[in-house]
Amino acid sequence: MTTQFSVAGVELELLRYPAQQESNLQAWDAADEHLLKSLIESEQAAVPTAIVNDSFGALSCGLSKLHPSWPLFVETDARTSFLGTEQNHGRNQLPMDNLQRFTSRDTLPENLALVLMKLPKNLSYFAHQLTRLSQVLPAGTRVLVAAKAKSINSALLDIFAKHLGPASASLAWKNTRVITCVSDGKPRPLAKEVTWAVPEYQLEISNLSNVFAANKLDIGARIMLENLPKGNFKSIVDLGCGNGVLGLRTAQLSPEADIHFIDDSEMAVASAKANWARNQLPADKGHFYWDDCMTHLPEEVQPDLVLCNPPFHQGEAITDHIAWQMFLDARRRLKEGGILHIVGNRHLAYHVKLQRLFKNCTTVASNGKFVILQAQKK
């Protein structure tokens, strides 16, 4: 894994978060390099700057390296992004007192003079972010968005025009481009929240914009719901909860249990919490954590069941380290006799990992694409 970042005279050591990941993944990409290179070559002044979707702090570290007092306002939905930014500022002995952190639901400051963004995969979420910016940016404010050249097309430029202002793309460099959008100063309203029913379980669900499966059950969740374990569970974790549908259904099946919802996405945790209230479940039985797996779960929480639908993407990277960490955390935190119950794509071969960690693994159900697996802590 390459950890030495070098562009236009800026030298940094950058690691992904958590640091123990596959050796072929690094903490930045060419789009980060292109954005910093453009700023340095244009001799950009250290004005109040929002940094949006900075995966592990490459952009904030780069600007802090250039000017330790550069006022930075960092927005992300991912807890691991905040933790990675802290980690890399520390590794490079860079200050953090010039940096304020925001989730994608927090109110943004109104004194921004420049915005730097990485293009997220989820364009509905991107539109949400542009709309938020339209509510605080004065006319004429530049918003620079770096992305792979192949991701930039007329439809993407139309999203800029609809939600913030006119935009144009730079020439390509290392297969990336920087889009320059100029705010037109017209505030847009945020899109209305979409709510949809899951009639077979008498549930009503809503998702915020960066939550997987926008307005219907995804296939993995559906097969999981059809095969939830039955038992006298007292403490249940919905790990990587998304909109919380698995935990909500489990609460119906085990009304005496405490349900703990955990996700790296702040919007996912907020959606799960809203859905808990929407479905009139007991306020004292639902617990919600914005966290990197179970890293900061209170020690007194000792689940007897962990439900998990592991992601195999982190941003643009395809990786199984998140699933591996989820399984490790489950083994560490489960009570003796507790159960890990997961769904995954068949080709990911999670049964091998579970057999290695738990010394047992049972196939509960499967179809052409997905498999439900269960392992018990003994």
Swiss-Prot record:
The lineage of its organism: Bacteria, Pseudomonadati, Pseudomonadota, Gammaproteobacteria, Alteromonadales. PANTHER family: RIBOSOMAL RNA LARGE SUBUNIT METHYLTRANSFERASE G (PTHR47816:SF5), RIBOSOMAL RNA SMALL SUBUNIT METHYLTRANSFERASE C (PTHR47816). Gene3D superfamilies: Vaccinia Virus protein VP39. It is an enzyme of class 2 (transferase). One of its GO terms (cellular component) is cytoplasm. Keywords: Cytoplasm, Methyltransferase, rRNA processing, S-adenosyl-L-methionine, Transferase. GO terms for molecular function: 23S rRNA (guanine(1835)-N(2))-methyltransferase activity; nucleic acid binding. Specifically methylates the guanine in position 1835 (m2G1835) of 23S rRNA. It is found in: Cytoplasm. Pfam families: MTS. CDD domains: AdoMet_MTases. This is Ribosomal RNA large subunit methyltransferase G. It catalyses: guanosine(1835) in 23S rRNA + S-adenosyl-L-methionine = N(2)-methylguanosine(1835) in 23S rRNA + S-adenosyl-L-homocysteine + H(+). HAMAP family: 23SrRNA_methyltr_G. Its EC number is 2.1.1.174. Belongs to the methyltransferase superfamily. RlmG family. Transmembrane segments: none annotated.
